[in-house]
Amino acid sequence: MAIVKCKPTSPGRRHLVKVVNNDLHKGKPFAALLESKSKSGGRNNGGRITVRHIGGGHKQHYRIVDFKRNKDGIPAKVERLEYDPNRSANIALVLYSDGERRYILAPKGLVAGDQIISGEDASIKVGNCLPMRNIPVGTTVHAVEMKPAKGAQIARSAGAYSQIVARDGAYVTLRLRSGEMRKIPTECRATIGEVGNAEHMLRQLGKAGATRWRGVRPTVRGVVMNPVDHPHGGGEGKSSGGRHPVSPWGMPTKGYKTRKNKGTDQYIVRRRNKK
């Protein structure tokens, strides 16, 4: 995997920084694990925009990724690594010894030809998945479940990982990348290692069009809108809005806490680090 800067033959190429991985499969994905994916354009079933800045973008197929890793005791061989347009991480196509194929998140260090397995007795090896009660304290994990058998929800993006820092009764304490410490039931599963493609954060798209290819539309400032469209709108000439920064719906937008308390807050041992 390499970070590539292009010759400045145009402004878009001048600022482009891309991640090149020659280990990725260059052909088509495995058809049996694809689903159609329709674009919403940010509209709901009434045709109204409910999420701004969404629209257009390249057509995509959804890759069905196995986040449960519940095929226990059956070894699998990694056939190839693939690009997935739906996530920042790469995915791996694995072939189980009984003939079934599945996609999994590709951990750092996993290559074609490797053997992986999931289940109670799986060894502590990159790509193996097992309950956290069987994983030693201090181990780096990813694709962590929050409820047993629900499927992985934590540490799924490129370069993500968590660390098991303690085990107490029916819970393990997990340290997340954000600095948050959280209790997770020991029956929940996690995969050993960290998610690959960590260089994803170093890329630069180079031009506005590359963002449009990804289905993201422009963000317009409130101060250049009309009063009917935004609380900062209107005024004569280039006025600055005349009030503290707010969202289009009037909510303070600079540091105002909007998170509602949840029942699962009791499992948070320490809040995330302040930015």
Curated annotation (Swiss-Prot):
NCBIfam families: rplB_bact (TIGR01171). Coiled coil: none annotated. The keyword Nucleotidyltransferase does not apply. It comes from Psychromonas ingrahamii (strain DSM 17664 / CCUG 51855 / 37). It holds the Pfam family Ribosomal_L2_C. Keywords: Ribonucleoprotein, Ribosomal protein, RNA-binding, rRNA-binding. This is Large ribosomal subunit protein uL2. One of its GO terms (biological process) is cytoplasmic translation. Residues 223-275 are annotated as: Disordered. HAMAP family: Ribosomal_uL2_B (MF_01320_B). One of its GO terms (cellular component) is large ribosomal subunit. Part of the 50S ribosomal subunit. Forms a bridge to the 30S subunit in the 70S ribosome. The lineage of its organism: Bacteria, Pseudomonadati, Pseudomonadota, Gammaproteobacteria, Alteromonadales.
